C-alpha cells in the first residue's frame, strides 16, 4: 500500500499516532510548494516546448558527472524550435556557460556572418550542443562523455524534428554519426542518419571557434555553406 506523507508543524501526540492507519507517515519537513507547482507546470506542458523542458530536467538530473558538477549552467538550445534546420556545436565555453546560451561572443558573431552569407538568419535556425555542460578548461570532451550525452542529444534531435542537420566540429560529428575520423576527411559531404524512424540529411563542417583559430580553413567552410544553401533550395525549405 502506498504511504502518504502528512506535514505537521506541531508536536505529535503519540497516542494519536498509535491509532493512525499504517498507510500514513508523518514528517516535520516543510513542503516546498513552489517546487511542486514548477514540476507540475513542466509535466503539463505539451508539444515541443514541454518535451524540451522535460529533457532539460532529465539532463539536469544526471548523477556522478564532473561536467555537470563543475558547470554553472546547463546550455540547452536557442532559436526557433520549429525550424527545419538544426545546428549542433560541440560544448559550451566559459562565456556560454555563464549566459546559458549557444554560440556567444566572437564565435556567435562569426556564425551569424556564416549563416547570413547563405541568406539564413541565426534566429531562424535552432542551435544546441553535443554536450550541455562546459568541460573543465574548455578541454575536448572524452569519448565516454560524448557517448553519455549522445543519448540526450538524439532525443533532442527527435523533438526538434529538423529537415537538415548541420554538425559543427568533431565532437558533434562523433556524437551524432559515431564517426571518429579526422573532420577534414568527412566535412562537406552529405550523409544520412536515422533518428527514431526518420532519415535526416546531415552535413559536417568546421566549428566557428576552430575557424577563429585557423582562419585559413574558412575557404573550406564556405564550400560547405554553399552546399547547405543548395540543399535548402533542393528540399524547398522556406527559412
Regions from the language model: what does each represent?
Residues 1-15:
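Long terminal accessory regions outside catalytic cores
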Residues 12, 16-19, 24-239:
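A polyanion-binding, active-site-adjacent surface
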Amino acid at each position: 500500500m502506498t504511504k502518504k506523507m502528512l506535514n505537521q508543524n506541531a508536536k505529535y501526540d503519540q497516542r494519536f499516532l498509535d491509532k493512525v492507519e499504517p498507510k500514513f507517515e508523518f514528517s516535520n519537513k516543510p513542503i516546498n510548494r513552489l517546487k511542486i507547482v514548477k514540476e507540475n507546470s513542466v509535466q503539463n506542458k505539451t508539444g515541443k516546448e514541454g518535451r524540451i523542458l522535460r529533457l532539460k530536467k532529465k539532463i539536469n538530473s544526471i548523477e556522478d558527472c564532473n561536467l555537470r558538477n563543475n558547470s554553472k549552467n546547463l546550455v540547452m538550445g536557442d532559436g526557433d524550435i520549429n525550424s527545419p534546420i538544426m545546428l549542433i556545436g560541440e560544448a559550451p565555453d566559459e562565456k556560454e556557460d555563464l549566459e546559458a546560451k549557444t554560440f556567444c561572443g566572437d564565435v556567435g558573431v562569426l556564425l551569424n556572418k556564416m549563416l547570413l552569407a547563405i541568406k539564413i538568419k541565426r534566429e531562424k535556425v535552432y542551435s544546441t550542443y553535443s554536450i550541455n555542460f562546459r568541460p573543465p578548461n574548455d578541454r575536448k570532451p572524452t569519448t565516454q562523455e560524448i557517448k553519455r550525452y549522445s543519448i540526450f542529444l538524439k532525443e533532442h534531435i527527435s523533438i526538434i524534428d529538423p529537415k537538415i542537420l548541420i554538425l559543427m566540429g568533431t565532437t558533434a560529428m562523433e556524437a551524432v554519426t559515431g564517426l571518429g575520423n579526422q573532420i577534414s576527411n568527412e566535412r562537406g559531404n552529405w550523409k544520412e542518419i536515422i533518428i527514431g524512424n526518420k532519415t535526416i540529411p546531415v552535413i559536417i563542417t568546421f566549428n566557428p571557434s576552430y575557424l577563429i583559430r585557423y582562419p585559413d580553413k574558412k575557404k573550406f567552410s564556405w564550400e560547405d555553406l554553399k552546399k547547405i544553401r543548395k540543399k535548402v533550395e533542393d528540399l524547398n525549405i522556406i527559412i
